[in-house]
Curated annotation (Swiss-Prot):
Belongs to the TmcAL family. Its EC number is 6.3.4.-. This is tRNA(Met) cytidine acetate ligase. One of its GO terms (biological process) is tRNA modification. Keywords: ATP-binding, Cytoplasm, Ligase, Nucleotide-binding, RNA-binding, tRNA processing, tRNA-binding. One of its GO terms (molecular function) is ATP binding. InterPro entries: Rossmann-like_a/b/a_fold (IPR014729), tRNA(Met)_cyd_acetate_ligase (IPR008513). It comes from Streptococcus agalactiae serotype III (strain NEM316). Catalyzes the formation of N(4)-acetylcytidine (ac(4)C) at the wobble position of elongator tRNA(Met), using acetate and ATP as substrates. First activates an acetate ion to form acetyladenylate (Ac-AMP) and then transfers the acetyl group to tRNA to form ac(4)C34.
Length: 369
């Protein structure tokens, strides 16, 4: 049977995600970000809730991406996630895209010209942001001309690179409805951005997602809920360059601005430059918030939930993969667990995120109905 992998954040889970799961074939394995997102922000609702949303709408198995895979630039995010999916026996990668590029051809180009392409990246001016360098690389070697500002394009190309190195087939699905960052109130296929922005509009949320009651009744957070803690971390840390990926230039810019801003958005606006994108600055601020340092990615895979079909698939791979289903005496990843502890501080009603939690079990798979 086909085992389809999907890399996701589900922040929050919406009708577009449900559509993607409906288009996917076979056993559907989701590699999902934990409580902090790829672009450097806390999830609006916690990872367990988002995993439940997915399992109630077609997913068979949801595993958690470690913190230092979740909160990364597109290439590292995709590479880390796809390598984990490959270990779980995934042979097909499904992802949404705004434009149906010839991803198979693009993957072949990368396989055949990987060294040249990586060398091209390294030669690009340091004044360019990483997305700008990546765009130039794809333009040079694959003739792809696009703005480079569409996250699903950038991620789609990153997935293509990662899948080509793991022998995984690609299954791009045309994205339905609103664009990735659209805040418009398109009711059927609203974007995650729009649902977060208009979360107080119950009618809109109910139209835009299949699990609206679960979402609306769950404790929610935004970046600003952590601003006081972030400010404390910045002002009291003796050397911010000890934090993961924070260099002296960025450390100085953050230190010099933190006293004069009242929101995370203001701080990001003050610190970001052409070279250091807002997404990169948010990731760095997330690292500072968590007090993250460079750490090895855990070999074990943490399971957030499954259907009966997903549980059977886990049993078929457990001899070759170290699986963690309960964190207690058995630890997993200390940095992810620290991130979970910080995440809980954003809302007193958030349930325990680590200790003693067991996978959510969806008794009936949507594909069996």
């Amino acid at each position: 049977m086909t085992v389809t992998g999907i890399v996701a954040e589900f922040n929050p889970f919406h009708n577009g995600h449900k559509y993607l799961l409906e288009q996917a074939q076979g056993i559907k394995v989701i590699a999902m970000s934990g409580n902090f997102m790829q672009r450097g922000e806390p999830a609006i609702v916690d990872k367990w809730t988002r995993a439940q949303m997915a399992l109630e709408n077609g997913a068979d198995l949801v595993i958690e991406l470690p913190f230092l895979v979740s909160v990364q630039s597109a290439d590292y995010f995709a590479s880390g996630a796809v390598s984990i999916l490959a270990r779980l026996g995934v042979d097909n990668l499904c992802f949404g895209t705004e434009e149906m590029l010839d991803y198979d051809r693009i993957g072949d180009i990368y396989v055949n010209k990987k060294e040249e392409m990586e060398a091209f990246l390294k030669k690009q001016s340091d004044s360019l942001s990483y997305p700008q360098k990546t765009q130039a690389m794809w333009q040079e070697f694959a003739g792809i001309a696009f703005s480079g500002q569409t996250p699903n394009h950038i991620l789609g190309l990153a997935y293509t690179k990662a899948a080509s190195q793991n022998g995984i087939r690609l299954n791009p699905i045309q994205r339905q409805g609103a664009g990735y960052h659209s805040s418009e109130k398109t009711e059927i296929f609203a974007s995650a951005t729009s649902l977060r922005k208009h979360q107080s509009d119950r009618f809109f949320v109910e139209k835009g997602m299949p699990n609206s009651d679960l979402f609306l009744n769950s404790p929610q957070v935004v970046w600003q809920d952590y601003f006081s803690l972030l400010k404390y971390q910045i002002m009291t840390h003796s050397d911010l360059t000890q934090i993961y990926q924070v260099n002296e230039e960025i450390a100085n810019r953050i230190k010099s601005q933190i006293r004069y801003v009242e929101t995370v958005d203001e701080l990001v606006d003050k610190v970001a430059t052409k070279r250091y994108t807002k997404a990169r600055i948010r990731r760095l601020l997330t690292y500072i918030l968590i007090n993250a340092v460079e750490s090895p990615i855990p070999n074990a895979i943490h399971v957030l939930g499954f259907t009966q079909k997903g549980q059977q698939h886990l049993k078929s791979v457990k001899k070759s993969v170290d699986i963690v289903t309960r964190i207690g005496s058995q630890t997993w990843d200390s940095l992810t667990q620290r991130a979970d502890s910080v995440y809980q501080m954003g809302n007193a009603n958030i349930a325990e995120q680590t200790w003693g939690r067991i996978p959510f079990h969806q008794s009936v798979s949507q594909s069996d109905l």
